[in-house]
């Protein structure tokens, strides 16, 4: 099978998936408020596509860590992006947890990168584990809910075999959801989990390990600007309905 997707292409696919998901989150609640019939199948389909975004971004963060010549600079950029994105993310109406203090997905990606970097500075296993658990705890606050993002990023970076890296990483990424399903099973939850894992594994099966074009700045601008544009659209519609 020819592997034609490089790292830059993966990021672009993840950005597109994220945009589709966020458009669904903004558009369908507005349609409901305007008493317009909302086709649930379309909203659900858009959200399923959107499920691809976070695992791919997590995978790319791990790849960036493994191949970066200046990890501290990489961390500063991602941390700055997380801070810049706080306001547009909050304007989207997705404020939970500690609200404007953190509250966006990039924080979880940043914490996953921190877990990798700072745990690798330690020699004692207990210190490594403590750092990873601390970053995981902070990610719960950042996302306003339980997520295994930090575990997934760590697994993507540390598992040696390329195939097991993807499988182990996406399972670690969804470890909390798997644990919840084990104790509180739901068919919808299982379908959502399976769709996320299978879609990620399908797309990354075409990954060739190459860096590709330098689009770092595209992602750093895209994330806050697309949130800002969608939040302004949402606010304008809500004002129109008043």
Predicted feature locations:
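Alpha-helical transmembrane segments and their immediate juxtamembrane cytosolic regions
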Residues: 1-242
């Amino acid at each position: 099978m020819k592997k034609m997707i490089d790292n830059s292409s993966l990021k672009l696919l993840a950005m597109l998936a994220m945009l589709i998901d966020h458009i669904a989150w903004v558009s369908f609640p507005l349609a409901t408020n305007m008493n317009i019939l909302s086709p649930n199948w379309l909203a659900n389909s858009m959200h399923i596509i959107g499920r691809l975004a976070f695992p791919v971004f997590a995978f790319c963060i791990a790849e960036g860590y493994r191949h970066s010549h200046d990890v501290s600079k990489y961390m500063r950029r991602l941390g700055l992006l997380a801070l810049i994105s706080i306001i547009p993310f909050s304007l989207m109406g997705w404020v939970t947890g500690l609200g404007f203090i953190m509250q966006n997905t990039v924080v979880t990606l940043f914490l996953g990168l921190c877990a990798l970097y700072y745990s690798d500075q330690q020699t004692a296993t207990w210190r490594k584990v403590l750092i990873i658990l601390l970053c995981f705890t902070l990610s719960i606050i950042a996302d306003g809910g339980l997520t295994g993002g930090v575990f997934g990023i760590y697994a993507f970076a540390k598992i040696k075999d390329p195939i097991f890296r993807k499988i182990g990483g996406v399972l670690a990424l969804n470890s909390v959801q798997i644990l919840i399903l084990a104790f509180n099973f739901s068919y919808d939850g299982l379908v959502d989990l399976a769709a996320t894992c299978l879609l990620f594994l399908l797309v990354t099966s075409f990954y060739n390990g190459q860096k590709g074009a330098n689009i770092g700045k595209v992602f750093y601008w895209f994330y806050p600007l697309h949130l800002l544009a969608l939040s302004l659209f949402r606010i304008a519609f809500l004002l129109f309905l008043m």
